[in-house]
From Swiss-Prot:
Class of the enzyme per the UniProt entry, highest EC level: hydrolase
Protein name in UniProt: Probable exonuclease subunit 1
GO BP term, pick one: symbiont-mediated suppression of host gene expression
Biological function: Possible exonuclease involved in phage DNA recombination, replication, and repair.
Keyword Hydrolase: yes
Quaternary structure note: Could consist of two subunits: D13 and D12.
GO MF term list: exonuclease activity
Pfam families found in the cross-reference section: Metallophos
Induction details: Expressed in the early phase of the viral replicative cycle.
Keyword match Hydrolase: yes
InterPro entries, per database record: Calcineurin-like_PHP_ApaH, DNA_Repair-Maintenance_Comp, Metallo-depent_PP-like
Matching Gene3D superfamilies: 3.60.21.10
Amino acid sequence: MRILFSADHHIKLGQDKVPKEWQKRRFLMLGERLNDIFHNHNCDLHIAGGDILDVADPSSEEIELLEQFMSRLDHPGKIFTGNHEMLTKTISCLYHYAGVINKVTSGKWEVITKPYRSPEFDIVPYDEIHKAKWKPPVSKLCFTHVRGEIPPHVKPEIDLTKYNCYDTVIAGDLHSYTNSQTIGSTRLLYPGSPLTTSFHRERTKGTNGCFIIDTDTLKVEWIELGDLPQLIRKTIGAGEEMEPSDYDRVVYEVTGDVVQLKSIKDSDLLDKKINHRVTKDAKLNLVDLDMLGELELYFREVEKLSQGDIDRILARAAKYVKDYN
C-alpha cells in the first residue's frame, strides 16, 4: 500500500495581517496540490495526521473552508486528531465534524475516533498518547501526533521510547521536515506543515512538505511544498516602497527615526514601524547657550543632521525665537 501523509494544515482565518480571501485561496490551492500528488504517485490512501484545524472551536467560516478543502480531496482518506483540535483530554472537535467530513468527500474520508491497529499500519492519535497504557501494536509502521525534541529548549511531551515497538513513526506536530529524529533505532519523521503558519524573513526551503510511504518496504519519500504561497516579512527603510505580492503575503517592517516614521501612512502591507535610532540618555552641555544654540547642538549631536539642514532649520526658527523673546 502507498500512503500520502500530511499534517499540521492549521486551517485558520482572521490571523493578523493575513487577508481572509488570500488565506482561503491558499488552502484550496493546497487541497488541489495534495490531490494531484495522491494520483500522480499512485497512492491508495491519504492520512491527515492532526491539526487540520488551528483551534478546537473554529468559526463557521473556518468550517466552511474545511469543507471546501476536503471536497478537493477526491480520494480515500483517514484523518485523526492533533493537540489543536482537543476540546478536553479525551474529546476532539473532529469527532463532531466526522459526519460533515464524510459527506463532503462523498464517503471517501473517515475520522478516526479511537486507537486504530492493522497489519499495514497503526494510528496512535493525540487522545491516546498520554494514556498510561496503549493498545498493543500490530504493525511496524505507526502514524501519530506528538511533539518530539528540538534541542536544547523543546522537550518531548511524552517518553518517546513508547514508540520503540515500531520501526518507523510518521508524525504531525513539529512543523519542519528538519525536525525529523530517531528514538534509538526507531525513525520519528515529520513532513512539516504543508503551508507556513507564521511569517518568515524569506521563503522557506527544505521545511514544508508531505510524505509518500510504502507500507511493504517502509520506504518514505518526502515531497517539498515550499513553492506554495508563503507568509513573508521584509524590513525596509523609511522612504522605500512597500511592494505588494500577487502570490505570497508580504508585509513590511519599516525602520527610520521618529520624524521619518511619523510620515509613514498606514497600509495593509505595514506590519510595524521600528525606530532604529536608539540612544542612551542625552548628555548635552547647554551651559551659556541661548535657545538657538541649544537647538543647533541638539540637531548636530542627537539628530546627526548636516550643517546645511541645521542652518535652514535655525533660520526658520530664528523669527519665532525673536517673537518669543
